[in-house]
Amino acid sequence: MIKWLCLFFSYILMVSSHSWLGLWLSMEMNSLSFIPIMIEESKENSLKYFLIQSVASVIFLASILNQSFSFLIPFALLIKIGAAPFHMWLVSISKSMSWKVLSLLMTFQKIGPLLGLAMLQFTNSFFIFISAFIGGLGGINQSNLRLIMAFSSVSHLSWLMVNMSSFFLMLVYYVTYLAILYFAVILLQQSGMYSLAQMNSNASLIYKASISFNLLSLAGLPPFLGFFIKWMSLEMNILSPLLVLALVVSSCFSVYFYFSIAMSSLLFPSEVKSKKMEIPGILSMGFNIFLPLFFL
């Protein structure tokens, strides 16, 4: 219970930090609170996470204390957040995590680094480009749903970086991504699904449709909510044509892959009929279909 309280308090400190040193202290508190939660599931994953976060923290602290190394601040934050090309640690530990811990890692654990990048208004085209393509291509031919979500997280980081020039746009994108992801995670956790093979046999039609809608929304397929926040990002930011093309193409890769998953799962006959599983499924479908009306 104490570790969860410390974790929650660290998020409050991150949001209320007004200096680099304050942000560093809150991120350290956050990491030290999150590691005990990871240890309960895997000591190996917690060790990997500790080492990566420690290296990034040392770089970050050295950068803010010595102006000669200030150019390293965004690199330290990108390592912490798992953006490409520093994403391999995130992929490595994601494949054996529970849905609860993985969802925290892909959402709330990114608050500190995202705030730091927003303070810098970091919109480097190279990192946006490489995160978009690795995130889009990485999920292809993966059968582990946790790995698919991890690569999806890398892809969405590219869109978050696109919106770094406006804190409001970044916040809207982040909150929307968080909501879509958590709907998907709730459904997957209830059924105990961890692989694509399980999607073909262990759920009712409504359940499979709802998880498919969430995946397609994460990929950015119209008319789901995920499409509208990506469209908003392109409309509200001044981007080079090449970068826009890269973002659109990477989203197309994701849509193609997720659409094939959705079709293969929905075409299989349903055997399980559980109202407990159908209620959140119906809610998530309504969320993804009707909320986009506010963007019109």
Curated annotation (Swiss-Prot):
<keyword id="KW-0812">Transmembrane</keyword>
<dbReference type="GO" id="GO:0005743">
    <property type="term" value="C:mitochondrial inner membrane"/>
</dbReference>
<feature type="transmembrane region" description="Helical">
    <location>
        <begin position="276"/>
        <end position="296"/>
    </location>
</feature>
<dbReference type="Pfam" id="PF00361">
    <property type="entry name" value="Proton_antipo_M"/>
</dbReference>
<dbReference type="GO" id="GO:0006120">
    <property type="term" value="P:mitochondrial electron transport, NADH to ubiquinone"/>
</dbReference>
<keyword id="KW-0830">Ubiquinone</keyword>
<keyword id="KW-0813">Transport</keyword>
<dbReference type="InterPro" id="IPR050175">
    <property type="entry name" value="Complex_I_Subunit_2"/>
</dbReference>
<dbReference type="GO" id="GO:0008137">
    <property type="term" value="F:NADH dehydrogenase (ubiquinone) activity"/>
</dbReference>
<feature type="transmembrane region" description="Helical">
    <location>
        <begin position="114"/>
        <end position="134"/>
    </location>
</feature>
<feature type="transmembrane region" description="Helical">
    <location>
        <begin position="49"/>
        <end position="69"/>
    </location>
</feature>
<dbReference type="InterPro" id="IPR001750">
    <property type="entry name" value="ND/Mrp_TM"/>
</dbReference>
<feature type="transmembrane region" description="Helical">
    <location>
        <begin position="5"/>
        <end position="25"/>
    </location>
</feature>
<comment type="similarity">
    <text>Belongs to the complex I subunit 2 family.</text>
</comment>
<protein>
    <recommendedName>
        <fullName>NADH-ubiquinone oxidoreductase chain 2</fullName>
        <ecNumber>7.1.1.2</ecNumber>
    </recommendedName>
</protein>
<keyword id="KW-1278">Translocase</keyword>
<keyword id="KW-0999">Mitochondrion inner membrane</keyword>
<feature type="transmembrane region" description="Helical">
    <location>
        <begin position="71"/>
        <end position="91"/>
    </location>
</feature>
<keyword id="KW-0472">Membrane</keyword>
<feature type="transmembrane region" description="Helical">
    <location>
        <begin position="242"/>
        <end position="262"/>
    </location>
</feature>
<feature type="transmembrane region" description="Helical">
    <location>
        <begin position="167"/>
        <end position="187"/>
    </location>
</feature>
<keyword id="KW-0520">NAD</keyword>
<keyword id="KW-0496">Mitochondrion</keyword>
<keyword id="KW-0249">Electron transport</keyword>
<keyword id="KW-0679">Respiratory chain</keyword>
<keyword id="KW-1133">Transmembrane helix</keyword>
<dbReference type="InterPro" id="IPR003917">
    <property type="entry name" value="NADH_UbQ_OxRdtase_chain2"/>
</dbReference>
<comment type="function">
    <text>Core subunit of the mitochondrial membrane respiratory chain NADH dehydrogenase (Complex I) that is believed to belong to the minimal assembly required for catalysis. Complex I functions in the transfer of electrons from NADH to the respiratory chain. The immediate electron acceptor for the enzyme is believed to be ubiquinone.</text>
</comment>
<feature type="transmembrane region" description="Helical">
    <location>
        <begin position="209"/>
        <end position="229"/>
    </location>
</feature>
